[in-house]
């Protein structure tokens, strides 16, 4: 990429609007089983990031649909450098091209001190953003939607999450903030096998585990927060990281809205709202040796709200958790008229001019006191203590 070759720390590479069709004959790098369509290996510096930004209000679209190397995993944007800032473009059409187990990614990050902002990752067979190595990264105001792997593993779509946060040991302070995930064939957000803490702040998850016509696909959790698989012999960290999920919203996901996923440590769950999921909140855990399932213990559960889930709260050992100011449907006699709006269409509407989430009244209690104490509407503009 000529622009990357010429860029130095402090530069901004402006990307003009229009559709950029990735050329199958000009893949940036092939390495082992991977093909990287665009590869970013050059770093900026502290206070002098290299920026790759959409020009003004123009809309660049990177269409990767024609890149289909046989028997390779395909990553559209492979980010290996640090002190980089990507903003304001779309990635679409990233393919899967083999039948066995594997995955493709629209964006995969390994660098540190990066900001990935206002990207739209959609209508592909690939994970939206997949974060592995690197520290101090912010994934800000991004959307991942309509992503479904219909090629590998009998087309069940089980590897395509909207956002994956799976940091390796030492990869600390990685945050997903203001993001949306909907109609991804597996989970909205997933941090299974994370070796360090992952934070989800003010993020939304809708209709995951389904296709756009509500055809059933993969697991279908809104927020899958933790876990290390089902095999006790799998090496696990001790202690496991204590993940943070606050100010988030989960709507009509196929499985759980918020799911502890057999994690080995309690989590911090503050000011989240769940609506019409199979399980609105599922706190299932395992002990530190990963040996057996148990009801969740050691969780801090403050100011959360649920309504119309098939199960409101499940797999929770309440006496062994801290619970405060929650408005769960089993305790509050809500009706549809208890809320200012239940208009789900507003949740996938256009973002604000600055890239922030659309301003909606969805699932906001009409009771002003309750609206200030519980649910994602109580979180706006706050940073409630997590520990």
What is each residue range found by the language model?
Residues 9-62, 79-87:
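Beta-solenoid repeat scaffold
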Residues 180-247, 252-265:
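Beta-propeller domains
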Residues 21-23, 28-37, 66-191, 197, ...:
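Right-handed parallel beta-helix
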Residues 19, 56, 90, 120, ...:
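A structural signal for beta-strand register positions
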Residues 8, 42, 47, 57, ...:
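Parallel beta-helix/beta-solenoid
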Residues 2-6, 23-43, 191-193, 235, ...:
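Short, T/G/N/S-enriched strand-turn elements that build extracellular solenoid repeat scaffolds
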Residues 11, 21-23, 29-32, 158, ...:
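Acidic, glycine- and Ser/Thr-rich low-complexity intrinsically disordered tracts
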């Amino acid at each position: 990429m000529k622009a990357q070759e010429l860029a130095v720390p402090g530069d901004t590479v402006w990307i003009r609007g229009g559709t950029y069709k990735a050329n199958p004959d000009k893949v940036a790098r092939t390495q082992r089983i991977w093909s990287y369509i665009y590869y970013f290996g050059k770093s900026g510096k502290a206070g002098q990031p290299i920026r790759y930004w959409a020009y003004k209000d123009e809309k660049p679209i990177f269409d990767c649909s024609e890149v289909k190397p046989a028997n390779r995993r395909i990553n559209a944007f492979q980010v290996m450098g640090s002190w980089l800032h990507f903003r304001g473009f779309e990635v679409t059409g990233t393919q899967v091209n083999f039948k066995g187990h594997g995955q493709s990614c629209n964006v995969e990050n390994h660098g540190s001190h990066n900001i990935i902002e206002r990207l739209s990752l959609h209508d592909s067979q690939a994970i939206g953003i997949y974060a592995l190595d690197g520290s101090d990264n912010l994934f800000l105001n991004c959307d991942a939607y309509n992503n479904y792997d219909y090629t590998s593993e009998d087309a069940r779509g089980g590897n395509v999450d909207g956002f994956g946060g799976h940091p390796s040991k030492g990869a600390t302070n990685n945050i997903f903030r203001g993001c949306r995930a909907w109609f991804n064939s597996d989970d909205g957000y997933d941090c299974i096998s994370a070796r360090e803490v992952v934070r989800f702040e003010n993020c939304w998850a809708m209709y995951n585990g389904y296709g756009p016509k509500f055809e059933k696909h993969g697991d279908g959790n809104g927020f899958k927060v933790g876990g290390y698989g089902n095999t006790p012999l799998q090496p696990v960290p001790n202690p496991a990281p204590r993940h943070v999920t606050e100010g988030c919203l989960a709507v009509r996901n196929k499985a759980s809205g918020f799911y502890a996923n057999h994690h080995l440590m309690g989590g911090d769950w503050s000011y989240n709202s769940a609506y019409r999921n199979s399980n609105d909140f599922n706190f299932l855990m395992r002990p530190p040796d990963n040996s057996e399932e148990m009801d969740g213990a050691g969780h801090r559960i403050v100011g959360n709200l649920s309504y119309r889930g098939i199960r409101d709260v499940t797999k929770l050992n309440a006496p062994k958790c801290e619970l405060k100011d929650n408005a769960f449907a089993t305790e509050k006699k809500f009706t549809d008229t208890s809320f200012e709006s239940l208009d789900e269409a507003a949740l996938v509407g256009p973002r604000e001019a600055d890239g922030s989430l659309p301003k909606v009244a969805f699932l906001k209690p009409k009771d002003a006191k309750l609206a200030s104490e519980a649910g994602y509407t109580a979180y706006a503009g706050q940073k409630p203590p997590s520990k």
